[in-house]
Design a protein with these regions (language model features):
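Nucleotide 5′-phosphate-binding alpha/beta core
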Residues: 1-82, 88-120, 126-129, 137, ...
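Short, intrinsically disordered, charge-balanced linker/junction segments flanking boundaries
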Residues: 170-181
Length: 181
């Protein structure tokens, strides 16, 4: 019961913030106008969230990305992340600083014998516009190391596969591995 009470209080706080004209983002403020009810008055806990219906993936495709930036975070750095775009126009989402907190907490779960503090890391993966590079880079820095990144472009890999250009695919794989070594 205590967890439910805390969850409901947190939901009310989040709804109040995101639907307040002073702090909310244009997307949710515009969405509120189409609902026919006021989320700040009628969402009183987690169970009420179903009133919004399903979140549509299509809302995340295309721009402008500023529609997702809350007014309450105006002036703060914004990071833009995208999906790989393999199912159409890439889905875009924004993040401010909270990914850093997420990965600092995640760092607590990493055993030091496998992720020694103060050691440098090598990341071979998509560098942008994905969250992964920033996440791994911050995690390495948080643990006292430096992250060296080798970019792997999954969109290019998928195009090579779809075209059946296996020779180019293997050449790209060799190129990426050579950079890592």
């Amino acid at each position: 019961e205590q967890a439910r009470t805390a969850l409901d209080a947190w939901v009310r706080e989040v709804i109040d913030w995101h639907f307040d004209p002073a702090t909310g983002c244009p997307f949710w403020l515009d969405r509120a106008k189409t609902l026919g009810w006021d989320p700040r008055r009628e969402i009183t806990g987690f169970g009420d969230l179903r009133r919004f219906g399903d979140f549509e993936d299509e809302w995340l495709r295309g721009g402008p990305v500023h529609r997702w930036v809350p007014r309450g975070l105006a002036g703060r750095p914004v990071f833009v992340f995208e999906t790989g775009g393999t199912t159409g126009i890439p889905k875009t989402r924004i993040n401010c600083e909270d990914f850093r907190v997420d990965y600092e907490l995640f760092s607590l779960t990493l055993p030091d014998e496998h992720f020694p503090k103060g050691s440098n890391w090598l990341m071979l993966g998509p560098s942008g516009p994905r969250r992964l590079r920033l996440a791994v880079e911050h995690l390495a820095q948080h643990r006292g190391g430096i992250c060296f990144c080798v970019d792997l472009d999954p969109r290019w890999v998928i195009k090579l596969i779809k075209k059946g250009w296996n020779e180019h695919l293997h050449a790209y794989k060799d190129h990426v591995i050579d950079q890592a070594l």
